């Protein structure tokens, strides 16, 4: 399954129902929820972008899977790579590598961290999307 492309649902609630997510597990930060927390967070960000009319939204990875971008959008004729992190641990090797090769790009990251501009990367808290 490592070579599989991500598949997203129309709605985060439907996704939670399909994987039989117990709301209590989400609220108490149970280890069971960790298995698909990243996918649910990506689903949330995608759903919010779609509701704001962002289109098209792409996913990108290389053949050897060394570079994977959760989302890529176009804004004002510029490519904008987007990384989504479910926690405050925001190490993103793919995004760092891309920005090293293409310093003219400005990337966005959505995570549990507060708003912060770090060179050509802007972190937005998940609640702000």
Per-region residue spans from a language model:
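Short catalytic-loop micro-motif centered on adjacent basic/acidic residues
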Residues: 58, 81-84
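Short beta-alpha junctions and helix-cap segments that line functional grooves
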Residues: 68-69, 82, 94-95
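Catalytic cores of nucleic-acid endonucleases
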Residues: 86-127
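Accessory nucleic acid-recognition modules appended to NTPase machines
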Residues: 1-68, 73-76
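Short flexible/disordered coil segments
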Residues: 43-56, 115-129
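Structural motif
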Residues: 78-80, 106
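Short, loop-centered acidic/histidine patches that primarily coordinate divalent metals
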Residues: 62, 72-76, 84-87, 110-113
């Amino acid at each position: 399954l490592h070579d599989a492309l991500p598949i997203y649902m129309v709605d985060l609630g439907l996704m939670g129902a399909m994987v039989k997510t117990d709301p209590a597990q989400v609220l108490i930060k149970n280890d069971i929820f960790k298995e698909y927390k990243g996918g649910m967070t990506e689903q949330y960000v995608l759903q919010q972008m779609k509701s704001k009319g962002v289109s098209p939204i792409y996913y990108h990875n290389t053949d050897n899977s060394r570079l994977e971008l959760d989302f890529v959008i176009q804004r004002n004729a510029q490519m904008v790579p987007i990384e989504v992190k479910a926690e405050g641990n925001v190490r993103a090797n793919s995004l760092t590598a891309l920005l090293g090769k293409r310093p003219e790009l400005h990337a966005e990251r959505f995570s549990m961290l507060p708003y912060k501009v770090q060179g050509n990367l802007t972190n937005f808290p998940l609640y702000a999307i």
